[in-house]
């Protein structure tokens, strides 16, 4: 499997953990891309989207792996433009910038944690 997109957490907004606890979701955004959103997002290093993320790909988050089950119609574009997408863990959504995932529980999110999408 080839790595399609890989970034590391640089900052965690105060509301970002709350979103994970209450909505099983994480909002990702390039570090410094939108300072007014910093409280709500997990900021990360800038990364290059080498190929589009598609259903069947794998997200590795620390040592935990998740299967991509849906990719919103705008998710790859927003990742490419500003590292932005919303990850939904073991739940469904309908927004165009969301990526749905299934797998085990989400590990603790900390600065330095790596997010890596891989696939064919």
Where in this protein do the model-derived segments appear?
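Short, solvent-exposed secondary-structure boundary/capping segments
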Residues: 75-86
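Short, conserved beta-turn/loop elements at beta-strand boundaries and strand-helix junctions
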Residues: 64-65, 71-77
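Helix-rich interaction surfaces within compact, conserved domain-sized segments
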Residues: 89-120
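Short, ordered loop/turn segments at secondary-structure junctions
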Residues: 32, 72-74, 120
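Conserved "cap/hinge" positions at secondary-structure junctions
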Residues: 62-63, 119
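Short, well-ordered loop/turn sites that connect or cap secondary structure elements
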Residues: 52-54, 59-60, 109
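N-terminal disorder-to-order initiation segments that are Gly/Lys/Arg-biased
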Residues: 1-40, 113-114
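Short, structured beta-strand/loop micro-motifs enriched in basic residues and often containing a Trp
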Residues: 37-48, 91-101
């Amino acid at each position: 499997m080839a790595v399609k997109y890989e970034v590391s957490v640089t900052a965690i907004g105060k509301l970002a953990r709350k979103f994970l606890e209450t909505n099983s979701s994480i909002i990702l955004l390039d570090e410094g891309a939108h300072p007014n959103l910093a409280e709500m997002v997990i900021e990360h290093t800038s990364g290059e989207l080498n190929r589009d993320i598609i259903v069947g790909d794998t997200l590795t988050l620390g040592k935990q792996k998740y299967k991509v089950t849906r990719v919103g119609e705008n998710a790859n574009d927003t990742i490419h433009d500003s590292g932005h997408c919303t990850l939904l863990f073991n739940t469904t959504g309908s927004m165009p910038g969301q990526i749905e995932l299934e797998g085990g529980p989400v590990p603790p999110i900390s600065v330095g944690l790596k997010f890596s999408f891989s696939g064919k």
